[in-house]
């Protein structure tokens, strides 16, 4: 797990989610054949965020992309019959259907969910590609609209910044993200 995932996990915990990191989905051989690839490795969900009172689990893909151009809307809008690329769960409906169904069953088998648990796919991005002559945050807004239209959750860099800022108002904890928030926003520190 990388540090960016750790920050997102802390932000989710601050919003009353229980977080599980690097969850391997136990896709069966039969399910692998259903998605067109019989030798794929077990899919790994970066973060599972369980909100018990809502009976909801968000399966987060976490991409920092801080040293790259960032998440591109065009990459998320691609549709693949057989999964490929960096956003497989978002761009291949058949793969998503199989993996999320198996994930839900795995969670039920582990006592972490029940048949009524709502399972949602989410993306947290540390950086979003921004076109040169475009107002700031345009691409983030377009990505959010696109993902929400498909019933996915999207945390843009701006959303993450606001959540980090809100951490400054939390009581002190020996957590790097909370300490950093308190250093960056001392006026909000309690």
Sequence positions of predicted segments:
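Intrinsically disordered, low-complexity Ser/Thr/Pro/Gly-rich regulatory segments
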Residues: 1-190
């Amino acid at each position: 797990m990388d540090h960016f995932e750790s920050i997102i996990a802390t932000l989710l915990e601050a919003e009353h989610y229980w977080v599980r990191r690097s969850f391997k989905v136990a896709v069966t051989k039969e399910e692998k054949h259903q998605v067109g690839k019989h030798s794929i490795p077990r899919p790994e969900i970066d973060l599972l965020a369980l909100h018990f009172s809502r009976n909801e689990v968000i399966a987060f893909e976490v991409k920092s992309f801080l040293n790259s151009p960032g998440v591109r809307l065009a990459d998320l809008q691609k549709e693949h019959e057989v999964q490929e690329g960096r956003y497989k769960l978002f761009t291949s409906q058949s793969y998503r259907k199989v993996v999320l169904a198996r994930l839900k069953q795995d969670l039920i088998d582990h006592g972490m969910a029940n048949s009524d648990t709502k399972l949602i796919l989410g993306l947290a991005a540390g950086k979003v590609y921004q076109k040169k002559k475009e107002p700031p945050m345009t691409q983030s807004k377009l990505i959010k609209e696109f993902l929400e239209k498909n019933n996915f959750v999207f945390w843009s860099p701006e959303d993450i910044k606001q959540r980090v800022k809100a951490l400054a108002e939390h009581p002190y904890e020996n957590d790097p993200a909370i300490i950093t928030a308190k250093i960056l926003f001392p006026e909000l520190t309690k």
